[in-house]
Amino acid sequence: MTNSPAPTTSGVVTRFAPSPTGFLHIGGARTALFNWLYARHTGGKFLVRVEDTDRERSTQAAVAAIFEGLDWLGMKSDEEVVFQHKKADRHREAVQQLLDTGRAYRCWMSVEDLALAREAARAGGPALRSPWRDAPPPNDPTAPHVIRFKGPLDGTTLVDDLVKGPVTFDNAELDDLVLLRADGAPTYNLAVVVDDHDMGVTHVIRGDDHLNNAARQTLIYQAMGWTLPAFGHIPLIHGPDGAKLSKRHGAQAVGEFQDMGYLPEGLRNYLARLGWGHGDDEVFSDAQAIEWFDVKDVVKAPARLDWAKLNFINSQHLHVAEDGRLADLTLKALQAQGAPLPDDAPARLLATVPQVKVGAKTILELAEHCAFALKVRPLALEEKTRNQLTDETVDRLKRLRAQLGAVPVWGLSELEVLLKSFAESEGVGFGKFGPSLRGILTGGSQAPDLNKIMTALGREESLGRLDDALASRA
């Protein structure tokens, strides 16, 4: 995936707007991906805005985690990142415009009266309407108060959603939401509308838990006289059991998936398939996803996290990834585990990865498959291998050693041919010497076919390990 800004050939502008109160959740990552894909598909722009108006809950650690996750996934903003809290003056300016045009009002409701009104609304009564909606100000208009939106009392508000289709809301059920708190801080729905307008956002693609907000935000857009963006509310991600995704379902943060050894391209591919698809295509490149993606094709039903499908998709990307990159990632994973490594571990991994990567689903599995190549001579043989080294087997391995030492080309096909011809010349099945040879070369670690093991180890290391074992039986 390229991180360079896309040339803008359309007026489409999407945005990802996380709240920095925690890690980058895979649900948020998928939202970012859908916005990124749609912007690239249309030749538009993908922007990022940090919605940090809640200063008490927002943390720099969370901001850093979000950007680390986006960077790892390869999705960077095409313009400078916007931090919402820095736009507070602009938000208050918009509220003043609503006050001036009669679309907002000051509310001095007491805490007690507000609690009663909310309780009545929850009990099925009318949506919250402040008695100050049409009342003159109190004797002391400077007393603490909030500013509320003055929404319509009747009629309906239509959200023509790109995913859900037309959704109609009864205005009588939409309360007069607070725009500015008593301390002058703007609220979410107000800030979102102002920022999306000022950033030129044309398509708001987000989780369908925001669908109700779309109606309220539509009314604010209309009151401000601004052009509405297109809304697309995508389904949430559920666990394999259909329940809301939670810790009991396993990893949730993008960083956790990275630590578990998934590749960014594998996770991107998998997340794209959660709620969207292109026919029967399961595995595809970024270029194909960009070509095929349209938010209108996102399904309405919640997607379920499927670990087996994720592992399969990631394995397909791992199998075609560049060997040098995989070797570097494997080395980092081993270092993070604190595993003792030989000085030439990078070279050993580079030689081993091509031979074992097809059997791995993640970088962590790849590290396990490479373990045999990182062992330092002399290897400690398992009891099973020692028991296999009978006098007959040792003599046979000595004859094999002589042929291996004379093979002119040390390669996969050459070693495969040699092993087959040796078994034929000995008049025995492979089982008479193969298991013991495997144990000698790997020390009992998981490993691929013998010709791949020896190709990964190279001539000198393979013969050295065999010589060590034969010498121990001398």
From Swiss-Prot:
Please, one GO biological process term? glutamyl-tRNA aminoacylation
- Organism phylogeny: Bacteria, Pseudomonadati, Pseudomonadota, Alphaproteobacteria, Caulobacterales
**Any idea what this protein is called?**
Glutamate--tRNA ligase
- What role is this protein assigned? Catalyzes the attachment of glutamate to tRNA(Glu) in a two-step reaction: glutamate is first activated by ATP to form Glu-AMP and then transferred to the acceptor end of tRNA(Glu).
Gene3D superfamilies listed in its UniProt record: 1.10.10.350, HUPs
According to its UniProt record, the EC number is 6.1.1.17
What organism is the protein native to? Caulobacter sp. (strain K31)
Q: Where does ATP bind?
A: 247
Q: Name one GO molecular function term.
A: ATP binding
Q: Give its localization.
A: Cytoplasm
**What HAMAP family does the annotation carry?**
Glu_tRNA_synth_type1
Which InterPro entries does this chain map to? aa-tRNA-synth_I_cd-bd (IPR045462), aa-tRNA-synth_I_codon-bd_sub2 (IPR020751), aa-tRNA-synth_I_CS (IPR001412), aa_tRNA-synth_I_cd-bd_sf (IPR008925), Glu-tRNA-ligase_bac/mito (IPR004527), Glu/Gln-tRNA-synth (IPR000924), Glu/Gln-tRNA-synth_Ib_cat-dom (IPR020058), GluQ/Sye (IPR049940)
The terms describing its cellular component in GO are: cytosol
